[in-house]
Amino acid sequence: YDRQVVYPIPKSLIRFNADNLLAVRVYDNEGEGGIVSGPLMIGYYHNEVLLSQNLSGKWRIKFDFNRRYTDYAYDDSKWDEIFVPATWESQGFNDYDGTASYRKSFVPSFQAGSEDLYLVLGKIDDKDRVYLNGKLIGRTEDMYRTPLGNRFNGDWQIRRAYKIPSGLLKYDEANILVVMVEDLGMNGGIFEGPVGIMTKENYKEYVEEYRFSSSPPFVRPFRID
């Protein structure tokens, strides 16, 4: 009852040139109830502005893992859709603890440059292995001795970020990103952002924001007018 509650809003749900309707269902267990304190607003995290490409939104998911799921030409059209970032339990995939595979196809929305790039995946509950175009580029254990991972207890609290090997990202065609998630209990999934691609310079700024805290920085107001 005393926690700040923040929910990601898919951009596709916001009507920028029309009225929007917000409904909040509150369940009170005992004592006083209701929306008890603010701020109440639609906002954004500064770290999402650091992304060269935002990969949050609709992904595909299958609740197991096979190495062939990472193949570039693998057909995932029969997989379920899921919103990232959010736990899979919050989206109706209840009572599942174990391995799941996330897949995302994307074409870069930015131009190729000489600067190193990083794939940032926010927080994942609990462990992960990440493949880009069929190549393993990172896993949970890679984060343990980094500024993002060496101050917090529990894999689910570690912010993931993996350097993209030079020459692996395709700029004129689709890329296939696969994240294998192993949930050891309770909630699972890619549950907190940002999720996307950063330049090395922006990644340095991102690391500084979280060097001493795994909590998101202050939400900045966003005007819709």
Where are these regions (language model features)?
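Extracellular and analogous surface-interaction loops
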Residues: 10-15, 103-115, 122, 164-170
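An acidic-aromatic loop/edge-strand motif
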Residues: 3, 11, 15-93, 142-143, ...
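Short regulatory "switch" loops immediately downstream of catalytic or recognition motifs
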Residues: 8, 109, 135-145, 163
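Short beta-strands within extracellular/lumenal beta-sheet-rich domains
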Residues: 5-7, 96-109, 157-163
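Aromatic-lined ligand-binding clefts that engage carbohydrates, nucleic acids, or primary amines
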Residues: 20-26, 79, 106-137, 177-181
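A broad, low-specificity signal marking well-ordered, structured residues that form hydrophobic/aromatic
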Residues: 53, 100, 104, 117
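Short solvent-exposed loop/turn micro-motifs enriched in small/polar/acidic residues
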Residues: 2, 99, 121-123, 155
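Surface beta-strand/loop "capping" patches
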Residues: 93-97, 113-115
